[in-house]
Amino acid sequence: MVFLFTIASCTKDEDVVNEEANYSIDVNLAKETDWQMANEILDLVNEHRNSLGLRTIKRDQQYASAYAVEHTKYMIGLEKINHDNFSTRSNALKDRGASSVAENVAMGYTAAENVVNAWLHSPTHKSVIEGNYTHSGFGVMQNSKGHYYFTQIFYKK
């Protein structure tokens, strides 16, 4: 049996060309995330941040999570991870008061500890986890084969 675990390098809003930011989303999408897994990820991220004396990240169960779920569904449809249309998500959150936005994505991990450890062993993902952010939204979902896809959006308010 072959297992595929993938993480994609993170995206920070400074690296993205601006797109049209006139974007609406159904916040009910946030309800579709696997909140048990998402909460475990957030706990692990905050444990790591606290060990460094960094501020605890607050969970955003509305807009950031709705954008994250939408992106996770998009990745599931393509069967690959990516940061496509990140600037749209970033600009939409900035329209709602965020000053900076970044995201980490992954697929194939079956436990929160595994995906967070993978991100922490990647310098670009680790820099997002340790970044100057205050809130995080989650799109944690399984495809029809039971494989997990992850989008974690970080932002500073």
Language-model features, listed with the residues they occupy:
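Disulfide-stabilized extracellular recognition modules
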Residues: S51, A106-K157
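Short, surface-exposed glycine/acidic/tryptophan-bearing loops
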Residues: S65-V115
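Surface-exposed patches in mature extracellular/periplasmic domains of secreted proteins
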Residues: S51-S65, E79-S90, K126-M141
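A short alpha-helix/helix-coil micro-patch that ends at or immediately precedes a cysteine
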Residues: V17-I76
